[in-house]
Regions:
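Bacterial Sec-dependent N-terminal signal peptides
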Residues: 1-31
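Non-catalytic cap/lid and distal C-terminal segments of serine-dependent acyl enzymes
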Residues: 29-359
């Protein structure tokens, strides 16, 4: 009997068992959502009295607490009327970012990353992630202040090749346009059901909701319309055509009444046209070509027709400009295919983002 061989074999078995146990323990760990806040200079002293202290939900992967390594970062932007709780607040299993990230890491679908979810709602329901003379400089806050804050406080890989920006609806608009403007900060972008605003679909002067929005003289009248399109028109106007001298909305509306009909008001209307990503693509072609990866998608039964129409137009424009991108239509509406282990966030967005990070 070879006792030495038996002892060595026993040690190998023990070592293998130890390594297996360590691996299982590692995979059994979960990430965590931490709450944080940032005092923003870009959002201080606004006409609409927005809160300059912005709340954040931040997903830290399992390995964050267990190591000293640095991680790539995804900035994830919410839609109009929502906050970061769109992604972090649901307690239903696999209906929140933490559950999906933890599941994907264990399944080796993607690896660990930090996800930053800021609250960029405004008093009129949404910033559209743009600089506004009325609600504040949300583009500067997101792309400059917030990124610097996260890189300073958390163990990030602080370079564009390890940063992505994605979002849903209004957040999809923000993700695509901020990446378009700041390829030195973000290298990957993904817009889910992106609310690419255009004068198409519901956003036309023959829509009764548009007429109601144009006629509304105060917040009470606006909310009484009970129309997301009517309210949304004013929300977008605070982003695209703000006017600090015109209370109570502090906007130039893109339409005006001419008799009983709404017609374009040229100055404000043209500002909206210039803020349409289809038009922006021409101006930012060089920047778009610097991005490593661009993707956007939509449910072909989206309740908002302007989203369907303008996402298709945006893809055609990028194709015409020879800008590499992925555009996908799927069977679904504005929200019903986002969540769960069979949903778009888990199977498409998170995987796409991680696969395109600089390794």
């Amino acid at each position: 009997m070879n006792l030495t061989k038996i002892v060595n074999t026993s040690r190998k078995i023990q070592l293998s068992a130890f390594l297996l146990l360590t691996t299982l323990l590692c995979y059994s760990q979960t990430g965590q959502i931490v709450s944080d806040s940032i005092q923003s200079k870009s959002l201080a002293h606004t006409i609409t009295q927005e809160n300059p202290v912005r709340q954040l939900a931040i997903y830290l992967p399992p390995g964050y607490a267990a190591s000293t390594k640095r991680f790539p970062v995804l900035y994830l932007l919410h839609g109009i009327g929502d906050t970061y709780e769109e992604f972090s607040g649901d307690t239903i299993k696999n209906n929140n970012i933490k559950d999906l990230m933890d599941a994907g890491i264990v399944a080796n679908k993607f690896e660990e990353m930090i996800i930053v979810m800021p609250n960029e709602n405004t008093n009129l329901f949404g910033s559209f992630y743009t600089n506004s003379s009325v609600t504040g400089n949300w583009e500067d806050f997101t792309a400059l202040e917030l990124v610097d804050f996260i890189d300073t406080k958390y163990r990030t890989i602080a370079k564009a090749s390890s940063r992505a920006i994605a979002g849903h609806s209004m957040g999809g608009f923000g993700a695509l346009t901020l990446a378009m403007k700041h390829p030195d900060i973000f290298s990957v972008t993904y817009g889910m059901n992106a609310a690419l605003i255009c004068f198409c679909g519901e956003v036309t002067p023959n829509n009764p909701a548009i007429v109601k929005s144009v006629k509304a003289k105060n917040i009470g009248e606006l909310l009484a319309t009970q129309s997301s399109i009517a309210v949304g028109l004013l929300t977008v106007a605070q982003a695209f055509s703000p006017n600090p001298s015109k209370p109570p909305f502090y906007v130039d509306k893109p339409f005006k009444m001419q008799g009983t009909k709404a017609v374009p008001d040229p100055e404000a209307y043209n500002k909206w046209v210039a803020s349409n990503p289809v038009q922006m693509a021409e101006r930012y072609k060089a920047n778009l070509l610097k991005l490593k990866a661009i993707k956007f998608d939509l449910g072909n039964d989206d309740e908002y027709r302007f989203i369907t129409e303008n996402n298709r137009l945006f893809s055609r424009k990028l194709t015409m400009l020879k800008i590499p991108h992925q555009f996908e239509e799927y069977n679904g509406d504005h929200r019903n295919r986002l969540w769960g282990l069979d949903g778009r966030i888990y199977n498409d967005m998170l995987s796409f983002v991680y696969d395109n990070f600089g390794k």
